[in-house]
Amino acid sequence: MPKATRGVLIECDPSIKALIVNIDSSQHNIILDELDDTHLMIHPSMVEVVKQKLNKMLAENTYNPNEEAAKATGK
């Protein structure tokens, strides 16, 4: 008999998908299924966790010229 699992369909760029897979690699409770290069099925209760972790990762890896100028002037 078929088994159905409730999930949330996520459509994203392959680079963002790689970040989500990286997040899931430490916990293994986020991704229910990798559908293709741009689609994932994730656990409904983990949507906010994924958003928070992605925002944190993207903020850490975003170049901010104002921040570099402040470091250069010693502020």
From Swiss-Prot:
Cellular localization per UniProt: Nucleus
Lineage: superkingdom? Eukaryota
InterPro entries, per database record: TFB5-like_sf, TFIIH_TTDA/Tfb5
Give me the Gene Ontology terms describing cellular component. cytosol; transcription factor TFIIH core complex; transcription factor TFIIH holo complex
Which keywords does the record carry?
Answer: DNA damage, DNA repair, Nucleus, Transcription, Transcription regulation
Q: GO BP, one example?
A: transcription initiation at RNA polymerase II promoter
Coiled-coil ranges from the UniProt annotation = none
Please state the protein's primary subcellular location.
nucleus
A single Pfam family it belongs to is: Tfb5
Query: Which residues are listed as membrane-spanning?
Result: none
Q: Subunit structure, briefly? A: Component of the 7-subunit TFIIH core complex composed of XPB/SSL2, XPD/RAD3, SSL1, TFB1, TFB2, TFB4 and TFB5, which is active in NER. The core complex associates with the 3-subunit CTD-kinase module TFIIK composed of CCL1, KIN28 and TFB3 to form the 10-subunit holoenzyme (holo-TFIIH) active in transcription.
Q: Sum up the protein's function in the record's words.
A: Component of the general transcription and DNA repair factor IIH (TFIIH) core complex, which is involved in general and transcription-coupled nucleotide excision repair (NER) of damaged DNA and, when complexed to TFIIK, in RNA transcription by RNA polymerase II. In NER, TFIIH acts by opening DNA around the lesion to allow the excision of the damaged oligonucleotide and its replacement by a new DNA fragment. In transcription, TFIIH has an essential role in transcription initiation.
The family classification in the record reads: Belongs to the TFB5 family.
PANTHER family named in the record: GENERAL TRANSCRIPTION FACTOR IIH SUBUNIT 5
The identity of this protein, by name, is General transcription and DNA repair factor IIH subunit TFB5
Q: Which organism is it from?
A: Yarrowia lipolytica (strain CLIB 122 / E 150) (Yeast)
Tell me the name of the encoding gene: TFB5
